[in-house]
Amino acid sequence: MAGKRTKQHHRLEGHVQPKIPLDNNYYNLLDKKTKIWQKNLAKKYGIYGFCYYHYWFNGKMLLEKPCEQILEDPEIDLPFCFCWANEAWSMEWTGKKTVIMPQFYGNKKEWKEHWDYLVKFFKDDRYICVDGKPCGDYYFWDALYLEL
């Protein structure tokens, strides 16, 4: 990760490249040291926990590895929860309407598979709960309501 970013170079006058983060702390959530650093920083400044985006596209997941690593590593002892980013991935930010990954909610079988995947996180002592119930959020409530 760091090597790729440090290959940047000054392109025009006033253009400051490469930008090296403080203490070489590149943002790489697959790196345990990054997660430990973020956890320590959060605790130092009184942040209770993190809410991670969760991507589930009819059984296909994206960016799930960091949370799976957290689940397996008790040293990353910071409360967390999920926000289900339940919207199609598209290229709207480029001005195009191209859908890269459509959001599809599926039938009862797909919902059960999704639940079965999430329940291991909900049962983790670090997962944020209120009155013993796991908390979370939906990115796009209307889409869920319209689909059901």
Can you name each region flagged by the protein language model?
Residues M1-L148:
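Glycan-processing catalytic domains of CAZymes
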